[in-house]
Amino acid sequence: MLETGIRGEAKEVVSESNSAQAMKSGELKVYATPSMIALMEQAAYKSVAAELEEGKGTVGTLMNVSHISATPLGMEVTAKSEL
């Protein structure tokens, strides 16, 4: 059952494949904003996946984020969610 307070977390290491250059959202080899959004959605899904009925899923419908600092290759990024 979905309840307020359910939490999720997703982590990944910044690599060339999730960089702004690879995602075509910039030219630098730093963590891309589209990658950050995807990681946030992973955390949100992980928070509720065990509570979803078979065949059900989640869909992101609204994001309001600030990506305020560049994260270089090799650093770990963590996204946390709370329902």
Feature annotation, model-predicted:
Residues 1-32:
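Catalytic strand-loop segment that frames the active site of acyl-thioester-processing enzymes
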Residues 1-3, 38, 55:
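Short, conserved, surface-exposed binding loops centered on an aromatic residue
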Residues 33-37:
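Conserved N-terminal beta-strand and adjoining loop/helix that marks the start
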Residues 38-42, 46:
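Short, residue-level hotspots on alpha-helical faces of the histone-fold
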Residues 45-78, 83:
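Hydrophobic beta-strand-centered segment that forms part of the acyl-chain substrate-binding groove
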